[in-house]
Amino acid sequence: MPIRIDTASADFTQRFNAFLTMKREVAADIEAATRAIVDDVAARGDAALLEATRKFDRLDLKASALRVTPAEVDAAVAACDAETVEALTFARDRIELFHKRQLPKDDRFTDALGVELGWRWSAIEAVGLYVPGGTAAYPSSVLMNAVPAKVAGVERVVMVVPSPDGKLNPLVLAAAKLGGVSEIYRVGGAQAVAALAYGTATIAPVAKIVGPGNAYVAAAKRQVFGKVGIDMIAGPSEVLIVADDSANADWIAADLLAQAEHDANAQSILITDSERLADDVILAVEAQLTTLPRAEIARASWEDFGAVILVETLDDAVPLANAIAAEHLEIMTADAEAFSLKIRNAGAIFLGGHTPEAIGDYVGGSNHVLPTARSARFSSGLGVLDFMKRTSILKCGPDQLRALGPAAMTLGKAEGLDAHARSVGLRLNLR
C-alpha cells in the first residue's frame, strides 16, 4: 500500500520530511566506468565507438554504417501504422505552435547618457539529441526535443539512438523525420554522448546535448558538461494530484497509474481534503491494476513510492505542493485556476478534471521534458530558450566614454587591475 499521511497527526512534519527525502534510485558507482568510456571515445574516436557498440549493443558495424540513411528512414516511415504517424504529425504541429510563442525578441535602446545597449538572440549551431533504445524508445520524446530546437533555429540536430541487435524503432525514425532531425546515428550509451561532445571522424561534435537516458548516459552527460551544454539530469517521473470532493476518483486513479506504469521508481501522489475521496481512489487504483498490461511495474511504483496525503483544508495543500515541486501537478478542485495561482514550484500544471497529464505527454503542445526530483524549485521544462543564446551589445561614443570612464577607472584601480583603468584612460588622455 502507498504511504498515507495526515496533517492532523502529531508526527506529520517528521513523516512528510522523510517522504520528501526518500531515494527512488539506487546510486550505482558507475562514474569510473563511464569516465573510461568517455575518455576512450575522446581519444580514439570511431574505433572506440564501434568497440563499445559491439560490446553493449551486440552490433558489429563499420564506421560507414553508423549513420542511418535517408532511405532507411523513409522505409521505416512507410512501415509505420498510418494512424500513428498521423497522430505524431498532429502532435508535432501543436508542439511547434506552442513553442513558436516562446521565441524571444532582440532589443536595442539608448539610455539617458546616450549609451547604446541591448541584446541579440541567436540559435545554438548544433545540438545532439539522445534517444533511449528498446522499450524506453518514445517517439513523442523525439518531437519534444527536436521541434523546439528547430523552432529556435538550430541548423543541425543530431540524433543518436542505440539499436540492440541492429533493431531500431520505426516510430522513432518517423518522429525524427517529422521533427526535422538532420542526422541519425545508430549508437547509444555513454559512448554516444562522448561522440557528440568530442566528435569522431564520422560524427561531428555538437554544442549541446539533450534527451533522457540510463544511469550511464546521465553520468556521461555530467562528465562532458563544460565541453558542451546539457539540458538536465532527469530522474524518475512523478505526478502530484491535488483534489477535493468534487473530483472523480476513477479519473484520479487512472492518472496516478499513468505515471506509475512508466517505471517502478516513478512516483504518484494524491493530496486531498476529503477522506472519502482518498479511500475511493485507493480502491479505484486496486481495481484498475487488475486490467493494466504494465500492472507489475505500476504496482511496484504505487506500493513503494506512492502517497496519499490528507489535509484539513486545500490551503494546507499549497505549502506541501510547493515543497514537493512535482514534475507534473494536476489540480482537480472546484476552482483549479485559483489554486494554481498559489503554486510556485511545478514543472507543468494541468488544470481541471478534463486535463489529464497524458494530454501534455503527447498532444497538448507544451513540452513534456520537465524537471524531476524537486528540481522544479529552480528550473523549468525544456523550451526554445534552451536552444538559444543571448549576446549583450554595448556602444559608446566619445561623449559617453567621458561620462562613464572615470568611474570605470576608479573601480579598475580599486580591484588592482591597472590595465583595465589604463585601457579607459588612454582613450580619455588620462594617466
Task: Annotate each language-model stretch with its function.
Residues 1-125:
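N-terminal Rossmann-like NAD(P)+-binding subdomain of aldehyde/semialdehyde dehydrogenases
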Residues 3-8, 183-188, 308-313:
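Short acidic-hydrophobic, aromatic-tinged amphipathic segments that line or gate anion-handling sites
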Residues 180-267:
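Conserved NAD(P)+-binding/catalytic subdomain of aldehyde/semialdehyde dehydrogenases
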Residues 322-431:
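C-terminal core of ALDH-fold dehydrogenases
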